[in-house]
Amino acid sequence: MVMSNISSIGTNYYSQIASGSKLQSAADGAAQMSIVQGEKGQINGYDMAARNAQDGIGVLNVADGAYNSITESLQRMRELAVQASNTAVLSDGDRRAIQYEVDQLKQGISDIANNTEFNTKKLLDGSNSDMYIQTGANAGQGQRIDTGNATLQALGLADFDVTKDFDIQTIDDALAQVSSNRSSIGAQSNSLDYTIGYNTQTSYNLTKTVSQMEDTDIAKAVSEMNKKQLLNTVNFMMQKKQQENQRQRMNLLF
């Protein structure tokens, strides 16, 4: 029986060395194993949350790139509006020609606003301006991102026409709105970047803690296994000697 127990202990150390984990079953420490499994769940949660936040930054980068193109179009529209304001020199035909380019720019802005998307989700038409990202390991730990609305209606440019009464301030207001949206996107991106760093560091710290609780101390395990194997050998030899002595006593009796 003793020999069996020693052999079992030696086998357990061998399993620890082979697997790298000193927690082979609940018998090795039910409470500690429960803690380790719980922390592993948290580690996986923080890792996934970091990836979610990175996806969120991807969404914001796409939106910001689209706003950059819209800004260039608005700046050109402003140049044309200033040109069209020179009524002392320009004819109605000249202003109509300018309006033709303005209309092309407006159509380009509309196309960007209605077609910019990330994984099939529209980003600048106002339909998905408030999106939720799970940025923490647990329920309720998330962040909402807003990419704004860049449609002509939202920018106040739907009826902008330099052949009629118009105000250059209308384009300045649109530029200010786009600039505000881009500033918001930058702030949200920075927040997500901070979250990625926090999640990554927390995951690393928890991984170290779990490693200390779970990983086998190879040198100690080998030493203990050798001790148990030596005890097993000694016990075997003692049993063999006892059996030999018994046989000798029996021979003397008969």
Regions found by a protein language model. Give the residues of each.
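Residue-level signature of catalytic and energy-coupling elements of molecular machines
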Residues: 32, 109, 145, 235
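Amphipathic, heptad-repeat-like alpha-helical segments
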Residues: 2, 62-70, 91, 190-197, ...
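Polar, low-complexity export/assembly segments characteristic of proteins
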Residues: 3, 17, 111-185, 190
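Proline-poor, low-complexity alpha-helical tail modules
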Residues: 1-21, 203-254
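Structural signature of extracellular appendage/secretion-system components
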Residues: 19-104, 110-126, 186, 210-213
